[in-house]
Structures are given as C-alpha cells and as structure tokens.
Amino acid sequence: MWERKEGDMPTRIAIACDDIGFERKEELKRYLVEEKGAEIVFDPVTCPEEGVNTFARLADDMAEVIQRDVCRLGIYVCGTGIGFTCQINKHWGIRAVQVSDPYSAKRARLSNNAQVIGLGMRVNGLPAMEM
C-alpha cells in the first residue's frame, strides 16, 4: 500500500487489539516496524488479558490519537473488526472500515480515505500483512 522512500519520515500508526487479536497484532507490529519502517505511536494492549472487553474504550482512545494528529492511520485486530469500527466511526472526522481482503483494504484507503481498518481474526483467513 505504501512504501517508505529514503529520507521520508516514518509513517506513524496506532495499533490495538482485543484478547482474540493479540498475537496477530504483535505480528503486524513487527512487520510494520521491521519491513515497512513504520513508527507505532499507540499500542495500549501489552498482553492478551489487557484486551478483554475493551474495544469501545480502545476505539475512543485511538480516535483521540488520530484527531490530535499524533498519527493518521490505525489498525485494530479482534474477532470480526465490526464492533470496533462502529464505535470509532462515532467520532468526528474518523473514517474506519472492517476489511477482509487486500483489495478492499486498498480501495478503502484510496477511494474513501479510510484512516483505520478493523481486521477480524474469526472471519479473515488471509494473512493480515497482505492488507
């Protein structure tokens, strides 16, 4: 989706998850930092237990981080990605979508300027890094 060029500032990204998405979030974080040169500026869930029943609070917190221009992009990983995207879309100026394939993720960003994607571990069999 985006490639970092020599001399570019790293893309700043917010990332969060619930207990279901914790392992995939950690994989994504490593991929984004090591392969894409991104900077993770919001990552409040440090163990699976911290993600239990927290999607609404995490959506509100991520929306605030984006609204304050700490970063412009966010990723949330949970069971379906639906509840989180519904909650974060309640915030002014936030455009979030639940995606289940790389093409939809790309079109959401290019056609709709989506800032946040929700990934569902229980509904998405594709490797999330492809998105």
PLM regions: where:
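C-terminal binding/interaction regions
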Residues: A14-E23, P102-M131
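Short, solvent-exposed amphipathic alpha-helices that sit
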Residues: E23-G37
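Short hydrophobic/aromatic-enriched beta-strand-loop microsegments
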Residues: I40-V41, I94-D101
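Helix-adjacent hinge/juxtasegments
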Residues: L58-V97
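Short, conserved beta-strand edge motifs with alternating hydrophobic and charged residues
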Residues: A16, V41-V45, G74-C78
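A short beta-strand-loop structural module common to alpha/beta enzyme folds
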Residues: E39-N53
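Short, Lys/Arg-enriched N-terminal segments with co-localized hydrophobic residues
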Residues: M1-D8
